[in-house]
Amino acid sequence: DRRFMLVSNHLSRFDPMICMVRFRRTPLAFVSKPGNFKIPLAGAFIHKCGYLSIDRENARNALTTLNTATEYISSGRLSVGIYPEGTRSKTGELLEFKDGVFKIARDSHAPIVVMTVSGTENITHNFPFRPTHVDMHIVRVIQPEEYAGMRTGAISSMVRKYMEDDLATQDRKNQNDTTAAVIS
């Protein structure tokens, strides 16, 4: 029942919805760009779910959003999901992380659930006629004791390394599966 901070790589606009299904028994809100709140119907839905708008162009407003996310977790209201890359990756490669987002976990003393996703980038191309295989891996749950006293940049580097290692393992597995299918 403990609230946590969920961090994941970001490939598609469908990532938060897929995560909400995966964590359906956990009250979970994401930090999202302001434009998403202007999308008809979807904007009202994410607002009602407690999503937080982050203004990446205004440091003071962004800090207010991070503080609100910290309060969500600390008060037990919601767990918070965030994409430390700050935007979707068009190539599937991890983009540079925004270290400041880890202030949420550090200040709320919350576990960090490290997750990777793959396949969500294909949903738009396949919908509605072909199903899309999506993989979600809970890579690691980092307890607050493991990052106590660390700066946000160090926490960011640790999380990124876990994600990179998991994505590399998935790539190797997928290459082996493809090779096995060709040989069969």
Regions found by a protein language model. Give the residues of each.
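A short, glycine/Asx- and small/polar-enriched loop/turn
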Residues: 1-3, 130-131
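Catalytic core of membrane glycerolipid acyltransferases/transacylases, capturing the structured
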Residues: 2-59
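Non-catalytic C-terminal accessory region of glycerolipid acyltransferases
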Residues: 63-184
